[in-house]
């Protein structure tokens, strides 16, 4: 387990049938993890996306709602969201303008989440080109030997963001 550099705030809530946990930096500018589990024995999906928006342990934003519905449709009993940038912003331009959009403990949070998951779905979209972060995270993940999946690739080869991808699209191995 990674030794985090900052103090973390962990908040829990029961959202419907799913205990929910969110981990934030002590300043709350960063959200490192968001986890919902309703039947962990059924397996867990890890979505690695761009950056956190407004979702909390209590409420989904549109993207996290899509991830939850997709995880349920795929037969998983839980999911977690990590992001290649942990800075909380609704607009990628605001995230890109932040002094440290990655967050001091983000790599540790991502790497701690990989063994937690039964399937890792990369989905950060074309904004992953910022600071070459998408490629760096992909290399970090590939070094673990875990199989990576995506929901489609952009023309530039970035794993597509899930917000506008239909539920009929199945995760595909990212080789």
Q: What label would you give each PLM region?
A:
Residues 2-61:
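Active-site and ligand/interface coordination hotspots across diverse enzymes
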Residues 52-54, 86, 127-128:
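Short, glycine/serine-rich, charged loops/turns that create anion-binding
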Residues 95-175:
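Glycine/proline-rich loop-helix segments at beta-alpha junctions forming the active-site rim
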Residues 64-72:
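Short catalytic helix/loop segments, enriched in acidic residues and glycine
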Residues 77-93:
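Short connector loops at secondary-structure junctions
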Residues 30, 63-64, 106-107:
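Amphipathic coiled-coil/heptad-repeat helices and related helical stalk/stem segments
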Residues 59-63, 132-134:
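Residues at alpha-helix caps and immediate loop-helix transition turns in enzyme cores, especially N-
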């Amino acid at each position: 387990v990674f030794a985090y550099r900052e103090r973390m705030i962990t908040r829990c809530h029961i959202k419907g049938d799913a205990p929910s946990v969110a981990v934030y930096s002590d300043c709350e500018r960063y959200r490192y993890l968001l986890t919902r589990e309703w039947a962990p024995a059924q397996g867990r999906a890890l979505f690695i996306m761009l950056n956190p928006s407004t979702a909390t342990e209590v409420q989904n934003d549109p993207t996290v709602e899509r991830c939850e519905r997709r995880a349920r449709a795929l037969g998983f009993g839980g999911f977690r969201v990590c992001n290649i940038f942990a800075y909380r912003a609704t607009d990628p331009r605001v995230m890109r303008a932040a002094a440290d959009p990655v967050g001091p403990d983000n790599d540790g949070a991502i790497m701690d989440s990989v063994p937690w998951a039964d399937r890792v779905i990369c989905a950060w979209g074309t904004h992953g080109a910022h600071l070459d972060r998408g490629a760096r995270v992909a290399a970090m993940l590939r070094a673990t030997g875990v199989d990576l999946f995506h929901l489609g690739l952009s023309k530039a080869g970035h794993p597509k963001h899930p917000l506008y991808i239909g539920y009929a699209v199945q995760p595909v191995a990212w080789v």
